[in-house]
C-alpha cells in the first residue's frame, strides 16, 4: 500500500492515516489487532504512532522496530573466542591472529605496518557487513546465501589482496555458528505482519514478511523526489558567503522558527562541523538542545586527557607530551607555567633531564605524576589485559569519570567493566600482545569507534538529528545547513574491499543505494511544515553549487509547469548601523622606554615601529617549540661556539685538527640525529675556513677577541641614560693595527652584498660600530661561511660614518617616541612575513 503525499497534511494527521490504514486492513483480514505487529523504521517513530492509535481507540498492534522486537523475544547470543564480536577494535586484533600466519600478511606487516593495519580495518568492516547481511536472511536460506556469496567472489579472481581479504571476511562470518537474535522474528507468529517503509526498503522486514505464513501488509511511505512538484513544506533557501555566515544564519533560522511557534525544530546534522558551531551559538542563548547524533568518544575531554596521559607514558619521554598531560590534568598554577617556561627557554626535550634537575618548578607535581605513570613505563610487549590493568593503576585518582564522556571512555576501554568469561572479548584481551605503540594505537581506535551521546534534555525545543532520523517525526520545522553539492546527496562510501557491482550482487550497501536512501530521506523532509535549506556558495576560491537533490526538486516543478518551490529565506534580524570607532595607535607610555636597546631592538624599530612596540615594549614573543627540528639559526649558534672555542684555545700546529676537536667538544650532549646535518655542513666548511684563515693571517690579520659583550650610552639629553648593548662575534687586528669587526653569517653572499650596498640600511654593523665607539679607523665585514665558493668577507664600507648617522636618526626617533609619537604598523615584505606580532597589529585586516 502506497502512502503518498497529501496536500495540507501534517505529520500527526499522517500517522492517523497510518493507524486507519492498519485498522481497516486488519479488519478486512479478520486478524486480531492486539496480536498483530507493526514494524517501524526507527525507535523515534514509536511515540507518534502510539499517539495516533490511542486517538483512534480500540486495540492497537504491537509497535516495534525489528531490533526492539528481536531483543524482546530473546537475548543476543554471546560471541565465543574466534567469533565476530561486533566491536571493531577488538575484532581487528582477532583478525590479526586470523591472518598472521599467511605469508602475504607477514610480508605486508613487516614492510608496511600502516598498510597492514588498514587491511585489518577493511577486513573487519567487510566481515561486519557480511554478518549484518546474513542476519537479515531467512534462517532456512542463510547457508545458501553464504555459498552464493562465496561462489560469486571466487568466480572472479580479479582484485588480488583485496579479494583475498574479502574471502577471509566471508569465511569468518560464515564460520560463526551462533543463531542471530533476529532469527526469533522468523519464529514469531503474530496474527499479521505490517511493515512501514521510509527511506528505502528494510531487507530484514522484507524477508520476514515474504517468509511468513500470516497476512502481511507493506506500507510504503517513500516519495519520488522527481515527481514532487508541490511539496507540503514551505521550502526556504539561504545562500551564504562563508562558513561563519552559514553558521550564524542557521542559528537565526532556528530561533525564528521557535519565535513563530514552530517547535520543536530539527537541526539536521548533515555537516557536523557547521552544526557544532551552530550549537555553540544557540547555547549562548541558553537554548536547551537534545543531540541524537553525539560525537566520537575521541573528541571528548575525558578522551583527550586519557590520550595525553598515554602519550606522556609511551611517547619516549618527550617533555612536550608530559607538559600537555600536566596542563590537561592538573590545576593551572604559576609553578606549572614556570616549568613550561623553563623547558622552552632551555630547549629541554627529554623528561629524564627534568628528573635529574634540583629545585624544579612544580617539582612535587612532576615527581608525583612521573611516579603515577610508572606502571606504564617500559613499553615492552604485554597482553592487552595487562596493559588495561596497568592503565587503570596509572589513572589512580585521576578524575576521568568526572569529565564529559568519562564514563563512556572507561566502559569502552574495559576499565569499568569486565568481559564475560569465555567470550570473544575476554579471549582477545587475554591473548593479544602489544608493545607500547601498539597499545596507544589500539586505544585511539577504540575511542574513534565509540560514540558519546549527551543525556536526553527532555522536551528540548531543538533536536539535533541526522536527516534519515528526521523522517515522519512531528517537527515544527527542519533547518538543514550544508545543502550544497559536496555535502548533501553524495551518499556514504561503499565497502573498501568490494566493487559496487560485487556489493550490489551480494545485497550489501552500495554508494548508489546510499545516495538513493539520502534522496528518499530528503523527500520525506518535504512533509514538514517548513524546510529551511542553507548553503555556502563557494568553497574557497571555487564556486559551490546546490545539492543535486535541490536541483531534482526544481526540475520536478518545472516539468509540472510550476514555479520552483524554493523561496528566499528572510533574515529577520534588524540591521544595525555601526559607527566607526577609530582606535588610537600604540605609543610609548611615559617612562616606559626600555632601559637598554639591543641591535635587534633597533632593527625592529627601523623595520616596523609596531613590531618594536610589541616585542620590546609589551615584551611579547613566540614560545619556543620543544620538539621542533633544528633550524639553521641553531646551526649558526653552534658554529659560533665552535669558532670561539677554536680561536680562544688555538695552539701552534694543525688548524684543521684543532677546529675539528673544537667541534667535537661543542657537540657533547647534542642529540645525534639532530647533530648529523650540522656535522655534514661543518665538514664542508672545515677546509674552506682553514684556507681563508691562512690567507687572512698571511696578510697580517690576527684574531683579537670573540663573543665580546659591549654596551655604551651614545645618546644625549633626555636619552642620556639609555644604554645600547650587544654581543660582537669577533674582533681582529689588521696588519696596519686597525680593529676589524667580523660577524659570522650562514646566509648567502648575495644577500650580504645587497645589505651593504645601502650602508644606511645595515643596522647591525652600525650598532656594533657604536659599541666600539665608532672610531674612524674601525673596519667591519660580514664573514659568509656557507658559500660554495669558499669563505667570503663582505665589507661594510666606512662603518664609522654609518654609525654616526644611525645614532643621529635614533636620537630623533626616540625623542619623538618619548613625546608620544604613534608607533604604526609600517612593515612590508619579509618584515611582516616572519613577524611574531602579525595579526596583533591587524594590518592584514586593513581595508
Question: What are these regions, as identified by a protein language model?
Answer:
Residues 2-66, 70, 74-83, 224-789, ...:
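Anion-coordinating catalytic cores for phosphoryl-, nucleotidyl-, and glycosidic chemistry
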Residues 142, 215, 288:
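Residue-level detector of anion-binding/catalytic polar loops
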Residues 40-189, 199, 203, 337-367:
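Basic/charged alpha-beta structural segments of nucleotide/phosphate-handling enzymes
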Residues 190-241:
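Conserved RecA-like helicase ATPase core segment
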Residues 172-175, 185, 206-208, 217, ...:
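Intrinsic disorder/low-complexity segments
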Residues 162-164, 168, 193, 731, ...:
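Hydrophobic alpha-helical segments, especially transmembrane helices
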